[in-house]
A protein has these predicted regions:
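Short hydrophobic clusters on alpha-helical segments that form packing/core surfaces
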Residues: 71-79, 121, 125, 153, ...
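Secondary-structure edge/capping motif, primarily at the C-terminal ends of alpha-helices
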Residues: 129-137, 164-171, 222-229
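Hydrophobic alpha-helical connector segments
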Residues: 116, 130-158, 214
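Short secondary-structure transition hinges
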Residues: 139-144, 159-189
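Basic, helix-initiating cap at the start of DNA-binding domains
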Residues: 4-7, 13-82, 91, 95
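Hydrophobic/aromatic-rich alpha-helical bundle segments in the mid-to-C-terminal region
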Residues: 197-244, 255
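Alpha-helical DNA-contacting segments of helix-turn-helix folds
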Residues: 114-121, 128, 183, 187
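Helix-turn-helix
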Residues: 70, 78-112, 116
Length: 255
């Protein structure tokens, strides 16, 4: 068994075993629980080495990068098994085959590891969204793009247990929400730049907030619908998309 990147999604790290050239996925488990910070209390016998925080910044040497990747892969596997709320540095160290002290050389606590994983997911979403945005050249094309983005995000949330666990177990964590909001603002500004190409008189002072509201509403409702599941899930998705599409259609066509 080893931790590696998916051959299908370069931004997703998976736990796999290779048998006769085949990839065998580890079964995902739905996570539940309440996020409890461990930044103030480390596990017994795993005291954090002293040192400047600069030593934990992204390493430049290939070997160090590989070890960081190994830690993140192990963390994702642990989250799949026990949820983000129960994640411990000692479990990550054991899963990666490294000592606790070695993990602390790269991350000062589990919160930093969770943040690193989330930032990877968000970078992946942003890259996919901006690629889809490239050929958009009209209001109608933008609204179709919007539907594709929302349904694509829904499928990702539904199929990626690790991403789902991070969000469902850590909604009370302000730092995580701040990272997400910063990424949403980044996407909103990308929308403004694109839409101004075919709506030159777009109200640039209003558009970022309008787009940001639509992005955050869509993301939140998507995650809630996945948690509810069943027939209600589809109803919520369809109604949310109709609402956001209608709001944006009115805003853009008023120019």
């Amino acid at each position: 068994t080893r931790y590696t990147r998916s051959p299908y999604d370069p931004h997703r790290i998976e736990t796999c075993s290779i048998q006769k050239g085949e990839w065998v996925m580890v079964n995902s488990k739905k996570a539940s629980g309440i996020w409890v910070s461990d930044s103030s209390s480390k596990e017994e016998g795993s005291s954090q080495p002293k040192g400047d925080s600069l030593s934990r910044r992204k390493p430049s040497q290939d070997r160090s990068k590989e070890r960081m990747e190994k830690i993140l892969a192990a963390a994702e596997a642990c989250i799949l098994e026990m949820g983000a709320a129960n994640l411990k540095i000692s479990d990550i160290a054991a899963a990666s085959g490294m000592a606790n002290a070695s993990v602390y050389q790269y991350f000062s606590n589990r919160e930093e590891i969770i943040q690193a994983l989330l930032e990877r997911y968000l970078d992946y979403f942003y890259e996919q969204n901006t690629q889809l945005l490239g050929p958009v050249d009209s209001v109608e094309a933008f609204l179709i793009y919007l539907e594709d983005v929302v349904y694509g995000y829904h499928d990702y949330v539904k199929s990626n247990a690790t991403y789902r666990a991070i969000w469902m177990d850590s909604q009370g964590w302000a730092e995580l929400r701040a990272i997400d909001r910063k990424d949403n603002i980044r996407l909103a500004h990308a929308w403004v730049e694109k839409v101004m190409e075919f709506v030159p008189d777009l109200k640039a002072d209003m558009a970022p907030n309008v787009f940001l509201t639509c992005i955050e509403t869509g993301a939140h409702m998507t995650r809630v619908s996945v948690e509810i599941g069943g027939r209600v899930e589809r109803i919520m998705m369809d109604e949310m998309i109709a609402m956001v599409r209608g709001h944006l259609s009115t805003f853009l066509r008023d120019h």
